Amino acid sequence: MRLRTRMSTTAAVGALLLLTGCGAADMTKQASPFANAQGARTVTLSVQSWVGAQANVAVAQYLLEHKLGYRVDTVQVDEVPAWDALSQGRVDALLEDWGHPEQEQRYVRDKKTIVNGGELGVTGHIGWYVPTYFAKQHPDVTDWKNLDKYASQLRTAESGGKGQLMDGSPSYVTNDKALVNNLDLNYQVVFAGSEAAQITQIKQFAKEEKPFLTYWYAPQWLFKKVPMTEVKLPAYKEGCDADPAKVACAYPHTPLQKYLNADFAESGGKAARFLKDFNWTTEDQNEVSLLIADQKLSPEEAAKKWVDGHESTWRAWLS
């Protein structure tokens, strides 16, 4: 299933990631010159521009450097360009993919330049959400059939007289315009511009206890700060989203995957084995994401704090 985008470093780049959404510019040219280098104890990881993906890389980088003795370079790359970079050996691993069947067919099955690195252990899901305080006041708003009833309350200056459905970046893969059209809803999709901008807007609405309807996804640390309730869309069935123009169903629940450059997977030694074994829970990821995004720790500091408290989890990845 195509999810977050059609395309979820160092501490300095980590800070940049918090300010950008899933539509950050293609940075493949920043790829490490050591990526896929024979015999080099250097690993280059792709970082997507949302905090959950940053949490994965932060912990993997910390353990690779402090427990296995590797140097780790990280590169910010949009999701689809990341597949190209991975195939070319510009990066060695991608730790959180939300589903790109076209790229999987091309690079994994046909060209065999990329291999599946196993499940991350986290299940991703996109949906429409309203704040829980609004859902408690109006329980029927959680059924899409009743959304038009509340369109006037969800109208904003940007939505042109219709209710507002807030999305993130225009570069995200989203079915929302088709859903609004095919479900004949009196709503306008309005893009915040990035994940960070969307979070800022959600927090502002919540501070003022205003109603809002937003495209959002799990896992995401913000749920702990702003409780939200999902709106039930028509049930997802396999293939219901095959034609982007005709989508009229909910988004699926997708086990997130890791992918490795094929040569790296074969010759990457302990680093490749470690990345294949890296597997944690939604709770683990959210714990690190909160440390980075809410408590403002650097990615390395957040990773160290998690590593110090979860040895029984990560020790198995080093075998």
What are these regions (language model features)?
Residues 17-21:
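C-terminal motif of bacterial Sec signal peptides marking the signal peptidase cleavage site
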Residues 23-26:
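Bacterial signal peptide processing site
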Residues 38-52, 70-75, 162-166, 275:
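Short, well-ordered beta-strand elements
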Residues 51-70, 180:
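Short, polar/charged alpha-helical segment
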Residues 52, 172-188, 192-209, 270, ...:
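An extracytoplasmic/periplasmic, membrane-proximal ligand-sensing/linker region
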Residues 85, 91-95, 164-242:
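Ligand-binding pocket segment of bilobal, Venus flytrap-like solute-binding proteins
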Residues 113-165:
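A conserved helix-loop-strand patch within extracytoplasmic ligand-binding domains
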Residues 126-136, 254-267, 290-291:
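A bilobed periplasmic-binding-protein/Venus flytrap-type ligand-binding module shared by bacterial periplasmic
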